Amino acid sequence: MNNFVKQVASKSLKPTKKLSPLDEVISLNECIISFNLDNFYYCNDGLFTKPINTPEDVLKSLLIMESFAYEKMIIKGLIKILISRAYINDIYFTPFGWLTGVDDDPETHVVIKIIFNSSLISIKSQVIEYLKPYNVNNLSVLTTEKELSINTFNVPDSIPISIISFFPFDTDFILVILFFGVYNDSYCGISYISPKERLPYIIEILKPLVLEINMLSDEIGRTSSIRIFNSTSVKKFPTNTLTSICEIVYSFDESSFTTPKTFTPLNASPYIPKKIVSLLDLPSNVEIKAISRSGVDFITHINNKRLTTILVIAKDNFLKNSTFSGTFIKENIIWKGIYTYRIIKSSFPVPTIKSVTNKKKICKKHCFVNSQYTTRTLSHIL
């Protein structure tokens, strides 16, 4: 989490007012939850590399997670339980490694690092009870020797700067970070999460309380920062205590703030839902609209209907040099024994398959070769 905040805030100007800590210190312990997923077979040995973990890398990891719907359901459900009882430090899942930080790879499929100041017995029992129906194995819920002491500070007279991004551990939420000053080498402030639907309200609430808002915008393939400036007189932020910026996040309680009367329309979002698709999986003989941005081609409309989830096109060698920007129509075919597709109409240049004549239309199978029943999974013909 600390690495994520550092990366998200790296290009934003932050207050440099030096703060003095209070005598009160927040003491926290670390717990590591790890387990294997039953019947989960996956290997990326010799291929996987992720040296930095930028916000773009985190968004890519979340996109990869969409290809593992069952595993995502288990992990996301567990995260929702933990958020109400502890603070999430990081998540490990074999296909994408550590979600926000950089660390050694563990030996289990899933690891969740949390910090807490409540009862470990209660957390452990909730974890065990939740995972019981999912047949996980090698489950471990253990505290480490790592103890964290978080300094606290009074709210200074300086005006804070706010950064808004997606919350990496649950994209149903946005992350709101307010920077007030510094102590030694650490920035000091307070962090909140709020349902993503409340983003316009959060922005209007913050405007009279901060010098500026820097919102991370998901541009599909890259991120940008949108600066929103305050145009009204600044009011004092309604909190009494700050901490060093860390894993501690609070739920944003809108009742503690003045209700905004107007809202500015937003044409950007910290997180856009998306998943990877093969052109084989798209419907045949209907118009499909695609956009290309930052080296990523994605689909926004099918059959004149806007999609609620962006579909990122996974290109094969046949179309690797094509840029999908416009509309196209495709159809699935059996060509030389291979189940594939061809583009039959497009507003942009694409290579074509000149002949699709195949009288027998026999497709080579990956297994069950003697069966008269033929279909495909997402990866195989059988």
Swiss-Prot record:
Annotated GO molecular function terms are: DNA binding
Q: Which InterPro entries match?
A: Poxvirus_F5/I6_dom, Poxvirus_I6_C
Q: What's a GO biological-process term for it?
A: viral process
Chief subcellular location equals virion
Q: Name the UniProt key words of this record, in alphabetical order.
A: DNA-binding, Virion
GO terms for cellular component? virion component
- What does the UniProt induction comment state? Expressed in the intermediate phase of the viral replicative cycle.
Subcellular locations according to the entry: Virion
Q: Give the family this protein belongs to, as stated in its UniProt record.
A: Belongs to the orthopoxvirus OPG082 family.
Q: What does this protein do?
A: Binds to the hairpin form of the viral telomeric sequence. Might direct genome encapsidation into the virus particle.
Report the protein name in the record: Telomere-binding protein OPG082
**Which organism was this protein described from?**
Monkeypox virus
